[in-house]
C-alpha cells in the first residue's frame, strides 16, 4: 500500500469508528418524526414487488424517489398497519422526486426546512425503511458535501442507508425535513446522497399524473458524459486514480469556480501527485470559501507535517477538535504514521 493509501486508510478507519460517538437527537423527537415517514410498496408489470420509503409533506401527499415507483402498475403506502392506495403522482423524473397522492392519509406532516442553508459538519439524521424491516430505522451523521445544482444543493452525508430507505427523510436536529434519501455511489466505501427539499417544494404545485405515466431516467442514471462533476470524481478518488481525478477536477474548477468541492478534489489530486505547492494554494482557497471544510484542514495538517512544521500540524488538529473530533483523530493517526515511517 502506498503512503497515501495508508493515510487514506487511517482516515477511513477513524471516520468509521468515530461515527458511533455522534450526539443523537432525543428519542422523543425521533419517535415523533417516525410517524411522518411511511413505507411504500409497488407492484410491477412483471409481477414482482418493490419497496421504498416516503415522507408526509402535505395533506394526502408524500414525497419519495421516482426510481421507487417507476414502471409500477400499483402503489400503496403503509401507515400504522393500514394499506392505502396511491391515486396519482407528481413526478420530477430528472431530479428523482415524485409526490404521491394518498387520499385519506392520516399522518403528521413534516416541517420542511432548507437544504441551501445547511453547513458542513452540521449533524443530521435519516429515517427510512431499509432492508425489508417493518419499523423505521434511523442513522446519524454529518453533512460532508454540498454540491450546487439547479438552484439548490445535493447533500452528501456520513449517515448511511440501505436498500428500501430510498425516499425516506433526512432531518436536522430541530426535526426539519432537509433532504430526501436517494442514492449512494458503488463500492464498499460508498458516498451517500440526498436530494434537496427546495426541489420538493417546487413540485407541490405540479399537475397530477396517472401512475402509469411513462417514467424517465434521473440525472444520476444518465450516461457518464452527462453526470455532474460531483459524481465523476468519486471513483477515481476512491481508487486513487490521481491522473484521472486531476483531469476531472481541473475541468470542474474551471466550469464551476464557485463550487468548493471542485477546488478540494483538485487539491487532493495535486497533493497525491506531489504538486504540494498548488495543493496548498487550493486547499487555502477551499477554506476561504468554507472555513469549516474539515477535510481541507486535514490535508493542510498533512502538508504542514510533511514540510516539517509539526507545530502548525498540531494547530490544525486543535482547529478540527473545535467542530469535528473524528477528523481531528484522523489527522492525529496520519501524523503518527508519517512519523513512524521516518
Residue locations for each model-derived region?
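Alpha-helical segment of the N-proximal tetratricopeptide repeat
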Residues: 222-261, 265
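Canonical tetratricopeptide repeat
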Residues: 265, 299, 333-334
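Conserved active-site neighborhood of the chymotrypsin/trypsin-like protease fold
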Residues: 47-49, 58-136, 151-154, 216-220, ...
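N-terminal activation segment of mature serine protease catalytic domains
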Residues: 21-55, 62, 74, 257
